Amino acid sequence: MNSEKQSRQWAHGADMVVGQLEAQGVKQVFGI
């Protein structure tokens, strides 16, 4: 397995999740 590629995919997914949370205004809840 190419762990480097897997890590990049995970990081990209995390960025998408954070973007969605921010779009929903959840970032205020977490105080980010």
Curated annotation (Swiss-Prot):
Its EC number is 2.2.1.6. It is an enzyme of class 2 (transferase). The keyword DNA repair does not apply. Homodimer. This is Acetolactate synthase, catabolic. The gene is budB. Does not seem to require thiamine pyrophosphate. Keywords: Transferase. It comes from Klebsiella aerogenes (Enterobacter aerogenes). It catalyses: 2 pyruvate + H(+) = (2S)-2-acetolactate + CO2. Pathway: Polyol metabolism; (R,R)-butane-2,3-diol biosynthesis; (R,R)-butane-2,3-diol from pyruvate: step 1/3. Belongs to the TPP enzyme family. GO terms for molecular function: acetolactate synthase activity.
